[in-house]
Amino acid sequence: MESYGRKRAWKKGPTRGKGGPQNAACEYRGVRQRTWGKWVAEIREPNKRTRLWLGSFATAEEAALAYDEAARRLYGPDAFLNLPHLRAASAAAAHQRLRWLPASAAAAAARGGAAAVPAYGLLNLNAQHNVHVIHQRLQELKNSSSSPTKPPPRTPTRANPPPPPLPTSSPCSTVTNSVGSAALPPPMSCFQALEQAMAATAAMESAPCDDDAAVVGFGADKPQLDLKEFLQQIGVLKADDDGATGKNGAVHGDDGELADAFGFGGSGEFDWDALAADMSDIAGGHGGALGANGGFQMDDLHEVEQFGGCMPIPIWDI
């Protein structure tokens, strides 16, 4: 029973190896450090296992003073204190809380008007470090607003001119933009060029073609000849008053032997095989050979000069 009345031995509050970097070196009771550097204070109620939160502080000494004040209220004059010699300093700091109040509220409190003092003036500012910082910042802003300073004059800065546009190129067309050049059409992509070409081709195919008009790009400067006129020019067929040429190139005459001799059958159609056989016979009689394309191959230039006036020109070479 005698040991029951004794005071408990001094024990360090925060757990070793946890909390902030200075938590293990702290010797204050009920004070521990967070991992991000803040100091907090807690105290256990008498005969209970619950703990009371005292607040967060910037330094370990402020947290220790908060614990000492709570211990005096809960345990009386026999409570364990972290900083017993700083009790007078903490009491003096309590009188300095009025400096955070407005001037009108402080004057009313000095005259005895307790009702004019706002409720936030009774807060424990020492236990709330963030409130200290807020009040200091508000005071600095108030002082700066009362004496405004002129901002330094801005020097005009010349903006750099934009770089000249780079030449744009595409797989189908290349357009170079230069200063002072005439307005050029926008570049055309490959797909647009292909669509325009297909549209032009479709328009040409859909347009009605004239039999007498020459096809553009193919034989435009060569006149269209009839088969009879062609044979007469090369000397194979002589002009005959009795014969006539129809629209489809068929030879009609009184004498059918002349038509059969030059490859025209009874139906009026030209027989190319018969013409090739006749040309082979002519070539064999004159000592020439028929080439691969139906042309004559002469042995020397004298034969070319001799038969040049009457030799037929192969129509496959035209």
Curated annotation (Swiss-Prot):
Ranges of Basic residues composition bias in the record: 1-15
Biased composition (Pro residues): 149-168
A GO cellular component entry from the record: nucleus
DNA-binding is among the record's keywords: yes
Function: Probable transcriptional activator that binds to the DNA sequence 5'-[AG]CCGAC-3' of the cis-acting dehydration-responsive element (DRE).
Family: Belongs to the AP2/ERF transcription factor family. ERF subfamily.
Name this protein carries in UniProt: Dehydration-responsive element-binding protein 2E
